[in-house]
Swiss-Prot record:
BP-aspect Gene Ontology terms: 'de novo' cotranslational protein folding; cell division; chaperone-mediated protein folding; protein transport; protein unfolding
Gene Ontology cellular-component terms listed: cytoplasm
Function: Involved in protein export. Acts as a chaperone by maintaining the newly synthesized protein in an open conformation. Functions as a peptidyl-prolyl cis-trans isomerase.
Protein name as catalogued: Trigger factor
Organism per entry: Streptococcus pneumoniae (strain Hungary19A-6)
SUPFAM superfamilies: FKBP-like, Triger factor/SurA peptide-binding domain-like, Trigger factor ribosome-binding domain
Domain comment in the entry: Consists of 3 domains; the N-terminus binds the ribosome, the middle domain has PPIase activity, while the C-terminus has intrinsic chaperone activity on its own.
Catalytic activity, EC: 5.2.1.8
UniProt subcellular location: Cytoplasm
Keywords: Cell cycle, Cell division, Chaperone, Cytoplasm, Isomerase, Rotamase
Positions of the PPIase FKBP-type domain: 163-248
């Protein structure tokens, strides 16, 4: 294989490489054997057409595209490795020569990893806005939240207040004409919940069961249904029931209802205090790690971050988001329709995050390289076993999914993050 690389501009260049006849000939034979199985040529049994007859009738060149498809991926990877390149985006491939009997010549326009000029990344001073101390108010808030979850809705005779739930029928119209989606029956609406458009819930406060209220609202200019956006609507709303939330007494019985492992309210408070302390400690560590890494990234200089890297990160994020939707049974088209957004909007939403994450990854990789971090076979095996335990998989499954190079990369990245974080001090 002949390989050359020509820099065209910062982080961009053209990689030229060849696929030799020593590789082409056996692949031609393999492709021919596969193709001839389906050929029907008069005078020959199906699958028994001699190669010389095939070449004369169809031409050897008719096999070239299949041969190229088979050989190109490995040839490209080998060329990148031989040229010592770190390619960070999909290449633009061009086959410049596929002459019979000659080595084939391919060019690839590639984007390479940008240079990272590290600044200070050890012994950093950082600020974090996370409290480690657990207060009585924290514990009480946690218990109150659980207490509210056990609350029951009871019918009240008095007028509705914020926080109450009303059961209503409503019919919406614009200029006296009803519109699609503007009608509901026996709908339970929490006042103050923000379920309905601004102003709707407020106009039901102070009214009682049996009343009919003309609710006048204006749809927001950015409302998802464009035919309603910015328009004033009237909702004739009948209140059937007003319900208030009735919370259980704050006592030992409540504690048992919340958590069957405790006997008293004091036990529950102590348990929650320990859980909150552990959670706050973890949040504090995460905050220190985030602040230290952010500072290391700010101190570094990345020489012309390629847009392609950001685009690929955005693409990964969008695909991950849409994949999560589908796993929850939500069709992406339906999501865009409900939210009034497009796939382009989603890409734009992830743009800044993708740029930040790309810069962070580059700096951490540069730290790992500068420190000469590596991963031993023992460390790789330990990582495999940990992943298998975390995801309830067999060790062999993890090894099939992740290559040794991928595992080694992850381990060195963890070491770099640990170095940046462990040497940082909080102001």
């Amino acid at each position: 294989m002949s390989v050359s690389f020509e820099n065209k501009e910062t982080n961009r260049g053209v990689l030229t490489f060849t696929i030799s006849q020593d590789q082409i000939k056996p692949e031609l034979d393999r492709v021919f054997k596969s193709v001839k199985k389906s050929l029907n040529v008069p005078g020959f049994r199906k699958g028994h057409l001699p190669r010389p007859i095939f070449d004369k009738k169809f031409g050897e060149e008719s096999l070239y595209q299949d041969v190229m498809n088979a050989l190109l991926p490995n040839a490209y990877e080998a060329a990148v490795k031989e040229a010592g390149l770190e390619v960070v985006a999909q290449p633009k491939i061009d086959v410049t020569s596929m002459e019979k009997g000659q080595d084939w010549v391919i060019t690839a326009e590639v984007v390479t990893k940008p240079e990272v000029k590290l600044g200070d990344y050890k012994n950093l001073e950082v600020s974090v806005d996370v409290e480690k101390e657990v207060t009585d108010a924290d514990v009480e808030e946690r218990i109150e939240r659980e207490r509210n979850n056990l609350a029951e809705l009871v019918i009240k005779e008095a007028a509705a207040e914020n926080g109450d739930t009303v059961v209503i029928d409503f019919v919406g119209s614009i200029d006296g004409v009803e519109f699609d989606g503007g009608k509901g029956e026996n709908f339970s609406l929490g006042l103050g919940s923000g379920q309905f458009i601004p102003g709707f819930e407020d106009q039901l406060v102070g009214h009682s069961a049996g009343e009919t209220v003309d609710v006048i609202v204006t749809f927001p200019e950015d409302y998802q249904a464009e035919d309603l956006a910015g328009k004033e609507a009237q909702f004739v709303t009948t209140i059937h029931e007003v319900k208030a939330k009735e919370v259980p007494a704050l006592d030992d019985e409540l504690a048992k209802d919340i958590d069957e492992e405790v006997e008293t309210l004091a036990d529950l408070k102590e348990k929650y205090r320990k859980e909150l302390a552990a959670a706050k400690e973890e949040a504090y560590k995460d905050a220190v790690e985030g602040a230290a890494i952010d500072t290391a990234v700010e101190n570094a200089e990345i020489v012309e971050l390629p847009e392609e890297m950001i685009h690929e990160e955005v693409h990964r994020s969008v695909n991950e988001f849409l994949g999560n939707l589908q796993r929850q049974g939500i069709n992406p088209d339906m999501y865009f329709q409900i939210t009034g957004t497009t796939q382009e909007d989603l890409h734009n939403q992830y743009q800044a995050e993708a740029e930040s994450r790309t810069k962070t990854n580059l700096v951490i990789e540069a730290v790992a390289k500068a420190e000469g971090f590596d991963a031993s076979e023992e460390e790789i095996q330990k990582e495999v076993e940990q992943l298998a335990a975390d995801y309830n998989m067999e060790v062999a499954q993890v090894q099939n999914l992740l290559s040794a190079d991928m595992l080694k990369h992850d381990i060195t990245i963890k070491k770099a993050v640990e170095l940046i974080t462990s040497t940082a001090t909080v102001k």
